[in-house]
């Protein structure tokens, strides 16, 4: 069996984090999914869906892909901490293209950074509902 891709979603208990993890959870045969969340409400929401949370400090260094699904106002400070923990060759997906234009993201030369927007074509082409 092929090695599963390890994907960690930072902000997994929020609105966008929930949408992303709901879709990724459908592919557990090929994806090992880490739900990273710090808010009590977000952690409770993840547990209600039947999943456990993993601290970012544990999940990020082991991840192939990290998806940053956090509120715009904290993206700069969160990205600094996350990017420091990334393993060379890993990829950070950012759901806020304005943050990249505004140069609010921490970057590294040995990692890949992808910016997408949730209101544009989905990163999951099999979506049939809005949540």
Segments from the language model and where they lie:
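Short glycine/serine/threonine-rich phosphate/pyrophosphate-binding segments
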Residues: 14-20, 75-78, 123-125
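Structural motif
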Residues: 6, 33-34, 52, 65-67, ...
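Short, glycine/charged-enriched secondary-structure capping and boundary segments
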Residues: 22-25, 48-51, 81-84, 106-109, ...
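Rossmann-fold NAD(P) dinucleotide-binding segment
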Residues: 60-104
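Fold-independent oxyanion-binding glycine-rich loops
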Residues: 12, 37-38, 70, 95-97, ...
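Rossmann-fold dinucleotide-binding core
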Residues: 95-131
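NAD(P)+-binding Rossmann beta1-loop-alpha1 motif at the extreme N-terminus of oxidoreductases
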Residues: 1-49
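Short acidic low-complexity segments
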Residues: 50-63
């Amino acid at each position: 069996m092929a090695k599963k891709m390890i994907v960690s979603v930072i902000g997994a208990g929020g609105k966008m984090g929930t949408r992303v993890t709901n879709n990724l959870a459908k592919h557990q045969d090929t994806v090992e999914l880490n739900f990273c969340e710090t808010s009590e409400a977000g952690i409770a929401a993840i547990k209600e869906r039947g999943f456990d949370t993993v601290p970012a400090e544990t999940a990020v260094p082991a991840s192939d892909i990290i998806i940053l699904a956090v509120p715009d106002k904290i993206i700069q400070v969160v990205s600094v901490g996350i990017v420091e923990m990334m393993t060379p060759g890993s990829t950070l997906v950012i759901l806020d293209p304005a943050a990249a234009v505004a140069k609010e993201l921490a970057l590294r030369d040995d990692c890949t950074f992808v910016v997408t927007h949730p209101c544009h074509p989905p990163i999951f082409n099999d979506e049939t509902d809005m949540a």
